[in-house]
Regions:
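Hydrophobic alpha-helical membrane-insertion segments
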Residues: 1-11
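Transmembrane helix-loop-helix hairpins at the membrane interface
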Residues: 7, 35-147
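Membrane-interface interhelical connector segments
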Residues: 12-43
Length: 147
């Protein structure tokens, strides 16, 4: 799904959000170049913390809140509850507006099974794997250029 929606996100980022400073949304080697002025030890420490916080802690807390707490409370909206919850989750990622189409599609596909089975653990695993894979790719991109 990411591969299908990546051209849309890239177009949004390079047109509508082109005013963002380099490194704010490091998704390519050109974006990551702004981070290369820092010492390798600082980058290792930063990306180590990033992987723990954004790859594990953040997704678990988000899933506990959005799918564990909020989704059951939105059930009064019936079949619209998963879509409403996904829209709220997408807007919650306000600092990444170029990724809204990707977040909306990826988590819409994830939230319906969670809503049906009332089991958030699959969502936690998927969300952690998604964030860890992106974080590891970003880490490799930046640290590969800092070698």
């Amino acid at each position: 799904m990411w591969f299908a929606l990546n051209p849309i996100s890239t177009t949004l980022k390079t047109t509508l959000f082109a005013w963002l400073p380099p490194g704010f949304a490091a998704t390519s080697s050109a974006d990551a170049a702004g981070l290369l002025g820092y010492p390798r030890s600082a980058l290792l420490l930063t990306f180590g913390a990033y992987l723990i916080l954004n790859g594990l802690a953040g997704p678990i807390v988000e899933e506990l809140y959005f799918r564990g707490y909020l989704l059951p409370r939105l059930s009064r909206f019936g079949r619209k509850a998963p879509l409403l919850e996904t829209l709220l989750f997408t807007v919650y990622h306000f600092w990444q507006p170029w990724l809204y189409p990707t977040i909306l599609a990826a988590f819409a596909a994830l939230v319906f099974p969670i809503y049906r089975t009332r089991n958030i653990y699959v969502g936690m695993w998927a969300h952690c794997l998604l964030n860890l894979s992106g974080g590891l790719a970003l880490t490799a991109l930046v640290l590969g250029g800092a070698a």
